[in-house]
Structure formats: C-alpha cells, structure tokens
Amino acid sequence: MEIKNLTTEQRNPASIHIDTVSTVEMVKIMNEEDQKVALAVGNQDEQIARAIDEAANRYKKGGRLIYLGAGTSGRLGVLDAAELVPTYGIKPERAIGLIAGGPGAMYKAVEGAEDDTNLGAEDLKDLNLNSQDIVLGLAASGRTPYVIGGLEYANQIGAFTISIACVKDSEIGKHAEVAIEAVVGPEIVTGSTRMKSGTAQKMILNMISTGVMIRQGKVFENVMIDVMPTNSKLVDRASRIISAVTDATQEEALQTLKKAENNVPLAITMIKTESNKDEAQKLLEQYNGNVSEVIKNN
C-alpha cells in the first residue's frame, strides 16, 4: 500500500481546526482522540495474549526479548527493554532494543537507515540470534523495510516473531507469526505517529513484557517480588512486600528475609508453605521459581 493511503497518513476530521481553537479545546480534542487508542488496543486482546504465551515459553528456555524498530517505534522498543532490567531484575542481555541507525538514532534521526532491509537482518546477526529468541518488530505504518528485513531473517533462524502496527493488513504482519494491528485511526496532527500510534505501541509493549515477566514468576499476586534488597532502604521495602502478601508482621517478614539470605521469593515461600529455607528452595526449583505455582500446588 502506498504511504498516502495508510490510515495513519489521513487527515483527522476531529482535529481539522485544532490550530484555531482555544488551548483548552485543543487539549480536549487530544484527550478524546487518545481515548480511542485503548479501544483499538483492546480489539487485539487475543493476538496480544498469543504473543505473551509463546514469548513466555521461549524466554523461560533462555530466549531474549529483542525489539526492532525505526524512529518513534524503535525508541519505544529501546525504552521497554531498558525498563525491564531495574523493574524485574533481569540481566540486560535478556532484553535488547534495536533502532535503525544504531544507538545515536535515539536522539537524532539517521537518514535512510529505516529504508535498508538488510540492516535489520544485520543487526540481528550481530546479536547471534537463535531459535529461542523473541523478535518484536514495530512500525506504526506497518511497512518499514528495516523491520521487514529483520523479521524475515528471524523467521529463517526460527525465532518467534511478533509484529506491532497501527494499520490493518500490514506488511510487517505478513512476516510475523503473530500480527498485532491496533488501528487507532488518523493522527491528531496528520502523520505524526508519535502520538496515537506511539501510545498504542507503548500500551502493547507494556502488556507483552509485563505478561512475559508475570509468567516467569516475577510477580506474586500483583506485587513485584524479584527485587534485590542491596541496601537498608530496599531491605525495608522487601520486608514490607513480604508482609503484604503473607500477612506476617513486618518484623516476622524481616527475620524470614534474613534466613532466606535476602531472597524475597524464597522468604515468601517459606512463610506461605510453613517450610524452612531448604524445603522452600526445593519447592521453588520444582516449579521453576514461580511462587504462585508453588502456593497453588502446596
């Protein structure tokens, strides 16, 4: 499809006079348009769930989350990858963001980089892509050559491929095992896909990466438990987390945390299953470190 015919490139009737209205009215128009984004993302629930389930399986076997995009889409991928490290305590090499043109393109556009089909494949080759990896290709327009080239190569290797676009029947979707297409409609400012399209992509990435981490057992109930209490403030926070999900007093939680050598999931398991450190450790090993599964089955 030609660029001019893409939904993301059409003029939005709701904002056609946005340059002449009051500032309050301008903001209202933006808010009303943004409300459509969540509905568009909601229409992709089944596809997003499919992406999470398979990505979680691959990740559990040692696969990496690898994000691939250009411009705003690339920056959103880099952002999601970077935030997983401090949020869930994963190693930086398990979540990697690739942007057309390299790291410098995060701050300044690199002309022509997104139009190079070979570049996407080359960037993945440099990471020694393997069949357990998960490649998320992002393009609001659904047609970025850099992303298409990367997805094609990932498919050849046997990696799990996911595409995230904001148009229907996208080109990148034809090169992905799971195609997510949140059709948000024309942008408030014509063609400015950092707006509604960017918001939709961020929401979808939040869902996928959070879902994958939940399936790794890094969340118990709705609390992040894979925290590293490396100082007194974090030890206090960890003990409060343990207390909140076990109904133990904070003092009991703190004592158990010490016995567990500052391992929060282990401390929670010890309290919830009324077991000692060694017994709790065996249970966690039996259920791949997933506290929720331990509690459900014991």
Swiss-Prot record:
EC nos: 4.2.1.126
Name of the protein described by the UniProt record: N-acetylmuramic acid 6-phosphate etherase
Segments traversing the membrane: none
Record's subunit section: Homodimer.
Pathway the protein contributes to: Amino-sugar metabolism; N-acetylmuramate degradation
Protein task: Specifically catalyzes the cleavage of the D-lactyl ether substituent of MurNAc 6-phosphate, producing GlcNAc 6-phosphate and D-lactate.
Residue ranges annotated for the SIS domain, each copy included: 55-218
Catalytic activity: N-acetyl-D-muramate 6-phosphate + H2O = N-acetyl-D-glucosamine 6-phosphate + (R)-lactate
Entry keywords, A to Z: Carbohydrate metabolism, Lyase
InterPro entries on file: Etherase_MurQ (IPR005488), Glucokinase_regulatory_CS (IPR005486), MURQ/GCKR (IPR040190), SIS_dom (IPR001347), SIS_dom_sf (IPR046348)
Extra facts: A lyase-type mechanism (elimination/hydration) is suggested for the cleavage of the lactyl ether bond of MurNAc 6-phosphate, with the formation of an alpha,beta-unsaturated aldehyde intermediate with (E)-stereochemistry, followed by the syn addition of water to give product.
Classification via Pfam families: GKRP_SIS_N (PF22645)
